[in-house]
Amino acid sequence: ASDVYKRQDMTGPTDELCGIRRPGHFRGVCTVVSKLFNIVAPDRAYFGQKDAQQLAVIKRMVRDLSFGIEIIGCPIVREEDGLAKSSRNTYLNSEERKAATVIFKALNAGRYMIMNGETDVSEIISFIKSQIETEPLAKIDYVKAVDADSIEPVNEIKGNVLVAAAVYFGKTRLIDNFIAERN
């Protein structure tokens, strides 16, 4: 009976990253999105990769509840200087806005490490953190590597790995990420 009547308590992909600081947030997201899906009955739904954890949670919900919907992740849209576009960017003063580009630069440096053969997550995360910490206005919430589908922590870059960061600039918390693919 438990296979037919799935209880949607959303553990797993909600337990890491943003879910640590925002307990219950993804339960609310699932409630709103599932109601929308029931009303609209789409064949496809598009979600941004910038909110990669939310994308994974929605994919899991669709699978668990047997919605016949294809969930498609859309690439991160960026400002000219690399900062991920977000409504939160408007809360940054000009100094914080300039400083916030360190997230993209640090993640890109981590991506290059992986492209050059590094697979040890602790080395990659440590390097990304050290790059972000060069910016005095940046306060790291997290920099982590997790399985891109399950959002479970990983120790090695193998398969699809989400490398994600959340960083405060003043009171504004920004998120960004990339997916490393290695078989």
Predicted regions located by residue number:
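Short, surface-exposed amphipathic charged segments that create phosphate/polyanion-binding patches used
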Residues: R7-D9, L83-L92, N155-N160
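Glycine-rich phosphate-binding "P-loop"
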Residues: R7-F26
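Active-site glycine-rich loop that binds ribose-phosphate moieties when present
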Residues: H25-K35, V57
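Proline-aspartate-enriched helix->loop->beta-strand connector
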Residues: F37-A45
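Internal active-site segments that recognize and position negatively charged phosphoryl groups
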Residues: G48
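Glycine-rich, Lys/Arg-enriched anion-binding loops that position phosphate/diphosphate groups
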Residues: D51-D141, V146
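Phosphate/ribose-recognition catalytic cores of enzymes acting on nucleotide-derived substrates
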Residues: F127-N183
